[in-house]
Amino acid sequence: MATVIERNFFRLLRAGLFSSRETIEPLSPWKWRRLYQLSLVHGVSETIWHGIQVCQDDYFVGLISPELKEKWSKTIVKTKEPDEDTEEAMGLTNPLLDRKLQAIIDQESSLEETPTRLLLVAIVNNTRAILNEGINLPLLMEMAQMLRQPAGTIDFEKLQSWISRLRLQPMADLLGTLNVMLLGFREAEVPFMKKNLEKTATQLTEELFNLNDGSTDEWYFTQKDDEIFVRTHNSRAMFWHVGHSARFSRLYPSEALTNFFKSFANSLTHIEE
């Protein structure tokens, strides 16, 4: 069950992302500081600060200390705006699937840039992020903003055909569920979502707020000159990634396996001679 900090975190995130009024629950000064820290960790402090401005008439928002408000306004970590990096697909590690992806992108790139193509890129990039690290909130927010474009902007029939070609349906279902659970979407607003994966989405969300887990950034290996064996830089991170990859092998088996071995190989390149 989500804590009051987590509930307010996503309420303010939605308020900042869509300029929508939300009802905020009371927080102690310590819990407001914790929410502030979480916004920094996940790169969404600017969006949540905007949400605070949108909800400034809410009684409990008015109880945020002036000191924290001043600190927040001065230490905003600006959420990265969509640019060439975020509008290009990260690519898939499975060679067969990646060739299919690049063929779709190349075909669409020869035409006028379309929101449908950009949404596919967002789905792929969010998928890669989830396979490697878990939920990436800035990427998920970009996807949410695309979904909130005026009706008819996105060709969901074409998008669905691409999702099927890339075997992305289970991951598309998961991303749709995250948009429904965390960002206030109705299922009807996410036409490519065929199944609600609430259990998996809940587990991912819990990991989002568990800052003690390792990540692939820490999953490197070192080797001393007088040793035969290599050691992991962070064994907790390694075991987390093994378990994380195993969980998603059922949702995207053709990509999860190759992604795991690519991450493993990348970690070995960090061996210190």
Regions found by a protein language model. Give the residues of each.
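Conserved NTP-donor binding/palm subdomain of two-metal-ion nucleotidyltransferases/polymerases, i.e.
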Residues: 1-273
